[in-house]
């Protein structure tokens, strides 16, 4: 041992703590590895300290008693990673803290982005913020200019008027400074209440932090132990994620500091030891700078560093996929081009985190994921048995899990597992109980299917479905970002990774799997190898390409670099060991999606070229005519640790002089029966440490040791190297139906797999659409849907985007399929939005792409529907509140080819969007035609993505199989709906149900449902519904179809495929010419966003499920400009904005579904789930000041269960605009049921700045607002359920 040179790295996970130590030689053969339980209070109080003690005993060759401070004078480096912050966030046991924010915004984190996390869960469960209490400070700043200004007006600093230049270069208007005396009084009261940690987040503090600093300094003077300023924690635009991040820091960092102090107390003579911690960005930092916010992904980040450092070869530059499978989840990541991939906004434990983190995707499928059979499908997760009780085999009464399936199929080696199971933790794995539970589950499945599946086939089916679940996030980080997944190598690590890695790789088309010798402790090993990182970032708002920009940016780079280098030099790094990475966070003007672009070469300034390349790769396009904005300047200084450099896999392969196939009789420890490809096979079990480098093992085989089990499939070959296992997969030809030894027309395993794959296609289409669009509606508010259809237009899979699109898209596609039957050619793409042919309201533009087989047969369709912010009509935003005729709402497209044989028809689109709607009296063409074009191209790109993914599927399965399961998945959904409706009849003892409600204008929606399961009759009859109105509340039939589909999916209460099968058993009767089936030419814009909500309320009330929700979308639009559509007429430049506003959800009823529930506050319900634009983005883009966005307390109807509260949204205009509101429930409040009180009605108020007049504008109106005018929208609360008792 070299005195004073010991290196130690530790990763404390939820179950195990992994430790690596080296005596100082840096050679791998001198490493010592220890794995111990993270929680074992009978033997030690703290796992990392115990790990250090055990390592020192080995490395220093002496006995060290427990319970005394550990002398680490011989330890040069002590590095740690921990899941402490993540666990605190998940378990909600962090430090009590307060949230200090701008007046009017105390409820910001409660409202969030106004969406609900699960659109099909009627009992909405929003994430509860981490703070204990919230305090508002009367302060305010805003941005003086707005980016949507068609005349690009730029202000200059003017201190007298309170206009100052912010850190970003943007002009900031200081409206109200905080009163320090008042602040001091407020904080003293807060301090006296016992709160000692606070988070401060004020609007626009990313560029103007002065007010936060004033309040922060006062807080420190008073004695608060931790003060988190959002402007320091995350100086980036977007108030919501920045505020969440500051609160997370205040909640987690004190816990981290206490833990670090406890570690320090357990150590002695640490003066010369570098004690560092792994951050979420993959870099190490001194303990004094380690924060809760930056430790969220501490452990997983170590794994990324581990595999990237040991498995990437810069000579061949083959990118890697990290596959880290643990007990409760699987983490996947990507490493390519020798660089870590970072993201700057993620969600952990439901909390938005805005901080540099490695791009790691997690799926709820791990060794302890629970296996279940529901609605004819094999389910894996998301529920987990966790460590306690754990899998059934752990002898603690746990359920069947993936681990049990592997054990039952002979894919685990019980002899290699320690005897730590059972109540006394002294028994081996329990195969007997696992077998019994699989027998019971197999009997249930066979009864449901009238089949003869074996237990092995069932267990193997669950393994296949689990593998598909884990393949999905891999596609998300590769295909969804423009990478070809099959061109990667997959690196397996984690406790369960080796059991599934080859199968997952095979399903993805990857032919190489790498497993490092330290795969079971790779996170700890990555921490051992990691570099030290110093990050510095500042906001800015410069225009790339302007002459002064380069000088300004280089100056800032220099200032940030000096600080970072200084900090690393103080940690004993030489200047030669420090590498600087310079980044600019860039976006196109008018968009909000930015990319962090690295300066590739120190002597080059080609950021425009680098950004365009990155944008084209990520999103599929770039702009030549848009200016590029610099949002942030970032420096990442890397202190190279130089701990060790491992030889690459390819170098190791070259060095081996002799390869030898393993002799099972001599080299294997023993053989055991294992189940592969539907049969039991004698499978050799090898101890990894017994195999010399150069040994080749043909699958099937099991390579294992005390910490890992690696399954080598029959189509694979493993080569043992000095530090890796190198596995090649013989890629199979296209798969056909599984020959499983039983005769079933539909294989339930394949049905489960195709359910995942079809949904994955729709989800990836949505990802592509969001990435490639430019409008706020699509990119920020997520007002779009994507889906896959069969050749008749029947819905096969619809991603859970916007509920009102769900059933209506199928009506649209099937109508187009009939209209164009036999006429479409490859390269054709359709466009439509007309309510007569399956459209909903005109702004929802549907783009449809047919797909053809190699023989020219049309085999399916993909489609995307997106809300366009302006398509012409009488008002900006194309959502006029008082439209009477369809033409007033904008362009109405019955059916056209937007792409004809591969050629985008831009002239036709101009005619449709600008010329045609502008011909009508009082109407304009589209006011944002460039956005229309961009979003249409994005929709075409999303459809193209869907067709490409189906093409990939045809390489795995033959076309006949795919088409067969497209039909089967619809049948499965149909059967699930029929079972649910039959249960309802059985519970209520009746076959007839009825409900009704009236709109604010008195129009009646009436429903009678007749369910006779024995006759297969399921009738939804809307006879008695009022006639269509001379207004825009008319709802095309497709909308009612959507409402029924949505409600039925919610009532099932379980995860079933969402497709046309849900509606196939039903007979839907809607009287022609009624409100729900208007004649051609009727105005419909309100039908989609208002009547749809009320139809949903009626259906849910009919089945006694819940009281009315707000029954409204609160559609708010404003803007300026327009044109007649005539190219020779002068166009008035302008802009348009559209948003929908949340309200209260109805209380749940005590019913056949179980006990009721309280409604949720401030959330979108029923047929919409679009996001609210972030306040800072809202004020940056438009000439507005948001005065208040808060919960409207007391607006929910009281009852046994209380309805959720609505919100108050107070918008002040800073320029003259036309503003409109289209809303309901302003006359008749949301109804309570069974004695529950009604929710409060909504209210829309106009405050005129010139006179101070307060005017109620009613539910549907347009105003012509002047600067200083305010529009206050108070949204309805939800109805209550049951009698209220004080």
UniProtKB/Swiss-Prot annotation:
Resulting phenotype, residue 324 to A: Impairs ATPase and 5-oxoprolinase activity
Summary of subunit composition and partner proteins: Homodimer.
Remaining remarks: Present with 3180 molecules/cell in log phase SD medium.
Main location: cytoplasm
Phenotype upon changing residue 498 to A: Impairs ATPase and 5-oxoprolinase activity
GO cellular component: a single term: cytosol
Role of this protein: Catalyzes the cleavage of 5-oxo-L-proline to form L-glutamate coupled to the hydrolysis of ATP to ADP and inorganic phosphate.
One GO molecular-function entry: 5-oxoprolinase (ATP-hydrolyzing) activity
Swiss-Prot/TrEMBL GO biological process terms: glutathione metabolic process
Species, as recorded: Saccharomyces cerevisiae (strain ATCC 204508 / S288c) (Baker's yeast)
Enzyme Commission code: 3.5.2.9
Keyword Cytoplasm: yes
Phosphoserine: residues carrying this PTM: 930, 1077
Gene, per the UniProt record: OXP1
Subcellular localization, as worded in the UniProt entry: Cytoplasm
Highest taxon of the lineage: Eukaryota
Broadest EC class assigned to this enzyme: hydrolase
Entry-linked InterPro entries: ACX-like_C, Hydant_A_N, Hydantoinase_A, Hydantoinase_B, Oxoprolinase-like
Name of the featured protein: 5-oxoprolinase
Annotated family: Belongs to the oxoprolinase family.
Catalytic activity: 5-oxo-L-proline + ATP + 2 H2O = L-glutamate + ADP + phosphate + H(+)
Alphabetized UniProt keyword annotations: ATP-binding, Cytoplasm, Hydrolase, Nucleotide-binding, Phosphoprotein
